[in-house]
């Protein structure tokens, strides 16, 4: 593995406390099988630190850096050799919420600027959706679905993916018939599904057989509340049980 041309940022950053910022960044160049002159090392380190906005901190001790600065130093060290592949192992998990959001934007910018292929491992669904072009969902060591963030979120392949990525309401049912209404362009098939709540009109990208047992996924943001009986399909009576104020939105629990 040490001969492969890739950079890696560990979850714990692995910043060496006895080295300053310059020395930490230069270490991969100094131990590389390719020999670099002192001036080459200096230029490469300065370029890497400038990329992650750490210019001017070359002589600062690693232990004097903030959490966000340590994260950027680990990233500079991974980028200094100009790798063909960048591996990130939950690099933001040790940061507080506000800093984590800022670093998500920074990582996205750097990836686009450097055009380096990046594999990012995370348990944070928001990070995965925000940072990725392609997402691979792994369950018990097996990849269960690969797709764009939108595909993963809107078209989960099974119960695990639907329940794992974002909040959802899962309803079991049996397909009774095809819908008579016209359907939207991005959904190829429409079926009437019999459930414990009655008949539900469900859209899917997959062709299904009449009588098939299926699982309907309804995202909270696709549910609308009304005090009057609406027209059309897919509405049910419910009792409001609880409302949680979460700042930018309300979490409403219905029975």
What is the predicted function of each stretch?
Residues 155-176, 217:
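C-terminal boundary and immediately downstream tail of ABC-type ATPase nucleotide-binding domains
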């Amino acid at each position: 593995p040490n001969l492969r041309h890739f950079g890696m940022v560990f979850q714990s950053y692995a910043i060496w406390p006895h080295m300053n910022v310059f020395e930490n960044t230069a270490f991969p160049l100094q131990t590389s099988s390719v020999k670099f002159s002192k001036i080459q090392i200096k230029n490469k380190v300065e370029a890497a630190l400038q990329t992650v906005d750490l210019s001017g901190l070359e002589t600062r001790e690693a232990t004097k850096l903030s959490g966000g600065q340590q994260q950027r130093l680990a990233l500079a060290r991974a980028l200094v050799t100009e790798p063909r592949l960048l591996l990130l192992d939950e690099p933001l998990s040790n940061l507080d919420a506000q800093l984590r959001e800022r670093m998500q934007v920074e990582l996205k910018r750097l990836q686009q600027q450097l055009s380096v292929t990046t594999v990012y491992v995370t348990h944070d669904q928001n990070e995965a959706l925000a940072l990725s072009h392609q997402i691979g969902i792994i369950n018990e060591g097996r990849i269960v679905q690969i797709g764009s963030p939108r595909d993963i979120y809107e078209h989960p392949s099974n119960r695990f993916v639907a329940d794992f990525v974002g909040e959802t309401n899962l309803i079991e049912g049996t397909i009774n018939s095809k819908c008579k209404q016209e359907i939207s362009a991005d959904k190829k098939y429409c079926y009437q599904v019999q459930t414990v709540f009655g008949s539900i009109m469900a859209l899917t990208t997959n062709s299904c057989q009449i009588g098939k047992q299926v699982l309907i996924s309804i995202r909270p943001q696709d549910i609308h509340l009304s005090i009057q009986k609406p027209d059309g399909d897919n509405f049910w009576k419910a009792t409001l049980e609880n409302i949680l104020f979460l700042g930018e939105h309300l979490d409403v629990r219905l029975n």
